[in-house]
Amino acid sequence: MSKKNVNKETITEVALEILHEKGISHLTMRNVAAKLKVKAPALYWYIKNKHELLQLLADYICSLISIPKRKDDWVEEIFELSNNIRSVLLSIPDAAEILMDTLPVTRERLLLIEKTLEIFHRANFPEDKIFFTVTYINTYVTSYVLDEQKQQKLLDEMGTEAIRQKFITSVSDISKDDAPYIHHHFKNPDSGLKNKEDFMLGLRIIIVGIQREIGE
């Protein structure tokens, strides 16, 4: 790839390659420039620093999220949108961390927020509850995926069986008399692994709380 090919699109493409190959710890201006076969200063025409690089990636990530078709039930729309967000974040290493480390000030990200706000306006939510509700759901989805991605890194680094045995050994070292609930809930080491079912359960609990708050 020659210098004349350097633009925001190719910078994004190369940054994504680095994320998939080595993760966010290796995502630097120097490494992006090296993959583009240019010197780091050549990137400054498009992005000034790593923060702007992350902003670029965050906007790209948000552009991949499908907005659900309008439904009569706002809950169904939020379930579908939340699942769409989770799926996209899980498809890109460290995507949740990137969203958490950047400001929601880019076009695609603001449009995603706009569409989410629209769902609650159409549902005639109390005006003073809309922004809080959107923020709270966004925090839950992003935090859940961040936990999933950190968990997956541990599984990749240590191995599922090694982690399972560590849990079994650690729990066995504590008597049932001292920690009966630990023994009860940690009988199956796999029970703590994040999955879609647990994600949806948490989201449902949040939705029920929101419905109660607005008296629905």
Q: What would you call each of these model-derived segments?
A:
Residues 1-22, 26-31, 35, 47-55:
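Basic, helix-initiating cap at the start of DNA-binding domains
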Residues 11-19, 57, 61, 85, ...:
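Short hydrophobic clusters on alpha-helical segments that form packing/core surfaces
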Residues 46-47, 133:
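Residues in the recognition helix of alpha-helical DNA-binding motifs
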Residues 67-111, 115, 127-130, 134-137:
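Hydrophobic alpha-helical connector segments
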Residues 122, 150-216:
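C-terminal peripheral helix-coil segments that are non-catalytic and often amphipathic
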Residues 30, 39-42:
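Key DNA-contact positions within bacterial/archaeal DNA-binding proteins
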